[in-house]
Amino acid sequence: MENKTKKFHLASVILSVICVVFVVEAAAPVASIGNSQYFWWIFMMLLFLLPYGMIAAELGTTYVGDGGLYDWVNTAYPTTKWGARVAWYYWINFPLWMASLAVICPRLLGTMFGWNPSPFVSLLIELAFIWIVTIVAFFPVCDSIWILNLSAAVKVVLALAVGGLGVWYVTRHGFANAGGFVTYLPSFRPASLSYISVIIFNFLGFEVVCTYADNMTKPKRQIPQAIVAGGIAIAVIYLFSAFGIGAAVPTDRINTDTGLIDAVSLITGRTGGFLVGLVAFLFLITLFGNMISWSMGVNSTAAYAADRGDMPRAFSLRWEKNGMPIGAALTSGIVASVVCLAGVLMEVLAPESSLFWSFFALNLVMLLLSYIPVFPAFLRLRKTDPERERPFRVPGGQKTAAWIAYVPMVLTILSVFFTAIPLSFDRETLASFLPITIGSILAVVIGEILIRLRAGRASAKETD
C-alpha cells in the first residue's frame, strides 16, 4: 500500500544515501591497516565506488521497484536460480550485521553511564536493540525519515569531529603512526587484506535507496542525483575520518568494534566524561539509523523475491494496515536474536574472540556474495533489453561498460576470498578465520537447500 501523504524530496534522498552507505562503525577496522589505508581508500573509490555507483544509478532508474538487486539479476537471468541466491545472500547478511552491532550496544551504554553490564544484562540490551529495529521496520520508510535524516547528520558530525580531533592531535603531538613514504604504499599482509573488504562494504547500499522509489516525488531524477551528491560527500567524509583515527591512534591500539570511541579517548586523554559519553551516545544513534535504513530495503527485497517463489513463503507476509513486509522483518529479528544467544556461548568458549568482528565479517562475506552477479547482470541487460528507456546511462560504449562492470566484480571476489579464507594455518589465524569460513559455507549450503526445496515444490505443483 503506497503512502500518499509523505514523499521524499531530494535533500531527504541524499541524506538517506549518506545514512545507508556511510557506516561509522566500519572505519576502525580499516584504520587498523595503518598508513596504507589511505592508498586503499582512494584506490577503491576510483575502481569500485565510482563504477558501482554509476551501475546502481542506471539499474535503479531503469528497473524501479522494491526488488533491488534481486530484480536486476532475476530480470537478466530469468531461467536460472541466481536471483534466488542473490535474495538469500542479501537477506541473510542483515540479521548477521544486526547481531554484530547489537553486541556493541552494551559497551556504548557502559561508556555513557560508567558501568560494566553483566553478561545477562548485556544480552537483554542486545535483544532490545534488535527488536526495536524490527518493530520500526513494520512501518513505511517515509514514516521514519526523521530517524534517517538524524542518523545521517549525526554520522557527518561524528566523522568531522574525529577528523578535526585528529588534526588537533597532530598539531600538538605529531602523527601516532609516523613513517616514511613506504608506509603509505599498499600493504599485502594477510591481516591487512582481510580488512580491505570493509572498504568495499563502506561503499555498498546505493541500491537500498532505489527500493525507496515509491516514496520519492521524482525517483528517476532523484536517484542518480542523490547517488552522485551522496557519493562525493561520503568519499570526502570517509577520508577525513580515516585521517583522524589513523593520525591519532597507534594501529596496535585500535579496537575493531569500538575504535571510534577509543580514538576520542586517546586524543582527549580520558576514558570517560561528557565528551566521550556524548560520542558514545551519537554512535549509538548511528547504529539504529544503519539498521532501520537497511532493514526496509532488505525486507522489501526479500518479500519481493518471496512473492515470486524465490524466498520462503514466510517472507511474503505483509501487514494489512500498510503493506509492509513484516514476515521478513520478524524472521530477521529471530535470526539475529539466535545469533546473539550463540554469541554468549562463543564468549564462554573463547573469551578472547571478537564477537563484533566474527559476526561482522560473516555479514561482509554474505553481502559481498550478493553483489557479484549484479555486474554481469548489468551487461546482460544492456544486450537483452536495449530498447528500455534508461533515464541515467553509464557513459561510454560496450567496451567501457565491460571494464566498469568487471573491475569492481573482480575486486569484490578478491575481497570475499581474503575475508573468508585463511592464508596461513597458525593457531591464531585459524582461530580468527575458521568461524567466518565455516559460517559462510553453512549460510551458502542452507540457501542452496532452501532453493532446491522451493524448486521441488514448484515442479510438484506444475505436475499436479
Spans of features found by a protein language model:
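Membrane-interface "cap" regions at the ends of multi-pass membrane proteins
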Residues: M1-F43, L49-M54, G180, E387, ...
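Select transmembrane alpha-helical segments in multipass membrane proteins
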Residues: T5-V17, F39, T79-I92, I125-F129, ...
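Membrane-interface loop-to-helix entry segments
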Residues: V121-H173, L204, I227-I232, L364-P373, ...
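C-terminal membrane-solvent junction of multi-pass transporters and transport-like membrane proteins
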Residues: N3-K4, F315-G323, L368-I421
